[in-house]
Amino acid sequence: MKICLLCVGRLSIGYLREGAADFEARLQRYLPVRIVELKEEKSGKNDAEYIRRQEGRRILEKIPAGSFVIALDERGRSVSSEKLAALLERHMMESTPELTLIIGGAYGLCDEVKQRADMLMSLSEMTLTHQMARLVLLEQLYRGFTIVRNEPYHNR
């Protein structure tokens, strides 16, 4: 199995870039991870729905064929670290070729992306910036694989 993260926008804050790079490198020990950064639509005079649609079009074009798609959304299903680990393990056992996780931009995801997703998942009931969400997601993926492998990182 491979993991693809489709992310709207770049990490512009140094400590987030460093943290994300660290967890991306750690994840590579378990399976190939690819992060695709998509152009963030400028807000200017554009309304939020227009921005979501434009970013959504770019996201939909980049979803790999045959991939199981998880879109991050504030109204998505909340999962614990253990449940995420179980989901990762299930997809590895079922030989899912690729798991694609989508992080929208500042205004979230358009309905078309949410409808395309096989699962909507929430990282937290609190609002996170899309840049912070990337770091949290990478850490949780790493934590999930350490749980699956019974490695000493996650404290039960």
Curated annotation (Swiss-Prot):
It is found in: Cytoplasm. Keywords: Cytoplasm, Methyltransferase, rRNA processing, S-adenosyl-L-methionine, Transferase. It is an enzyme of class 2 (transferase). Its EC number is 2.1.1.177. S-adenosyl-L-methionine binds at L72, G104, L123, S124, E125, M126, T127, L128. It catalyses: pseudouridine(1915) in 23S rRNA + S-adenosyl-L-methionine = N(3)-methylpseudouridine(1915) in 23S rRNA + S-adenosyl-L-homocysteine + H(+). InterPro entries: Alpha/beta_knot_MTases, RlmH-like, tRNA_m1G_MTases_N. One of its GO terms (molecular function) is rRNA (pseudouridine-N3-)-methyltransferase activity. It comes from the Bacteria. The keyword rRNA processing applies. Its main location: cytoplasm. One of its GO terms (cellular component) is cytoplasm. The keyword Nucleotidyltransferase does not apply. Homodimer. Specifically methylates the pseudouridine at position 1915 (m3Psi1915) in 23S rRNA. Belongs to the RNA methyltransferase RlmH family. This is Ribosomal RNA large subunit methyltransferase H. It comes from Syntrophotalea carbinolica (strain DSM 2380 / NBRC 103641 / GraBd1) (Pelobacter carbinolicus).
